[in-house]
Amino acid sequence: MRPSDYWQDLLRPSILLDSPADMIVYGMGEQPVVEIARRLEAGEPVAAMTDVRQTVVRRRLDEVPAADAPDAIVLNSWRRCLRDKKAQAANFRHIEQQSNRLDGGVALWQAYDDMAVCVNPMHPAMTTAEIDASFDLPYTRQPHLRYRGKTIPAYEMIKFSVNIHRGCFGGCAFCTISAHQGKHIASRSRQSILREVKQVAAMPGFKGYLSDLGGPSANMYGMHGKDLSVCAKCMRPSCLHPKPCPNLNSDHGPLLDLYHAVDALPGIKKSFIGSGVRYDLSMAPTGDARTDANNRRYNRELIERHVSGRLKVAPEHTSDSVVNIMRKPRFELFRRFKEIFDDVNEQAGLRQQIIPYFISSHPGCHEADMAELAVMTKDMGLKLEQVQDFTPTPMTLSTEIYYTGYHPYTLEPVFTARTDAEKQAQRKYFFWYDPACRADLADSLHRLHRPDLARKLFPGGVPRGRAASRQPADRRPPKNSRRKR
């Protein structure tokens, strides 16, 4: 059960079979590691530990359950997936659905040539007491000693930040959070979070500013299903797409209360939200007057009090068909959120920026979609910097579509730009405002028979036929053009 290798463009066997390891612990590993340690201490050999949740183990072929076993799913064999990419796509649907089950799902089995691999179910999301116990351990909050005296840019970015929850129910097709943490939120208690904030405030070099109070998504703290019996039956990969689940308690009130408690601590001048905000969550009407009022208040307080000059959000694309595959909201919702952002800034006398992230060459995206993206973002006065070309990453729906050519939930074919030329043709539309790109883009729009878009992008007109002399083939994006995913 391993995704394709991007560099080789091959479907590899399970990483367990490619390594000398006896067992793999996957996901957030506190619970399985503790269980393994206790069983080892009791004298149990590793070879006998075949039932530990969140582990992957080798099994004999004669141990593979029957296809109709109630407590297991037998996936298409690795050999069959090598022959039939549609079989691999079908496998992924089971993998994603089970990783998002409230109870952790069932075991997944896959046969190889002379043995089988069993992926034991995930643990259910941690309780508040369990996640507090993990976060309250006496961490040093310092890099490893081998880096003493060296600057680590990633550490500098997060050293004064606090993680307040795990899990994400956004279900973005290109994200691996569900594979690591699941979609159900495990929230720390306010007391645990405040203890850590006090520790951060006492760190050398702290000047009163928390860089982030966040998580995989910034604004899912304390959220869960209203009726957990409904959640227990649910296998939706996203609680927000195609529209927010009516069973979701999306009240941002507890999160606002947490922000207020943190900001009231001695030594805290301001707490910023550096994690990505799901504006489709805070803007979705719920029908509950109190929740809707809290969510409107969240948007205002977030923009007015918790932005360090730039607010990061991720519309990712403007095309309805592309964002549907991505499991992201329609671009129109970003327009509405930007209007709120601009209004709050004007009323508060602030000069903050909203920084949208976009992806080119995502499965389902055609060059014409990127041309329309360029026009739509130009019309909004945006010159994009935080962008990336889609790169396959393990355990994501998008990567399965990229490799197999099929959508795992429909098994219908999906176009994906795969060659360097196809990907470069899409990516260049991000930089329509760069004079070095204009002639090449004008030629491309002529090839696409879209003079309407050419006139909108370049109302003054751009002569065609000079692309080769105006833009090197290996042109790089502007510096700091996209954060890592």
Name these PLM-found stretches:
Residues 199-355, 359-363:
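Conserved SAM/AdoMet-binding glycine-rich loop
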Residues 231, 237, 460-485:
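Acidic, low-complexity intrinsically disordered tails
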Residues 22, 134, 168, 172, ...:
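Conserved, mostly hydrophobic/aromatic
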Residues 150-176, 209:
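N-terminal pre-triad scaffold of radical SAM enzymes
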